[in-house]
């Protein structure tokens, strides 16, 4: 498989009290999954924008690991990178870093998200029941 040309998306957010559970006050895992999905979707959008495959939906989230928790006030930086490209699917690897209030950083999470490209995001199939092929030249260039 060819190397994918530096298609990345960075998503940053701060942990607020409503993002945490009550004991101890650490971020909900569901909040982290949601933010990972947002980062991955941004990466796919950047890769497929202005193409017939411009609509994509998340179909699977795999290999998720939470290494440490996050507290109120921490800055989380999610970096999404395209790791595999199929005919109608895109795999995105997301890695999260926690930046403490004192500026120190540590890995917080990672996972893979699979997207499929669709004609209409409200109806995940085309008229003949097939998904939209991804124009690889948009992602790999013309070389």
Residues covered by each model-derived region:
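Hydrophobic beta-strand-centered segment that forms part of the acyl-chain substrate-binding groove
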Residues: 40-79, 83-91, 104-111
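HotDog/MaoC-like acyl-thioester-processing domains
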Residues: 71-72, 83-143
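Hot-dog-fold acyl-thioester-processing enzymes
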Residues: 1-58, 116-143
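Preference for bulky hydrophobic residues occupying beta-strand positions
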Residues: 13, 59, 64, 94-96, ...
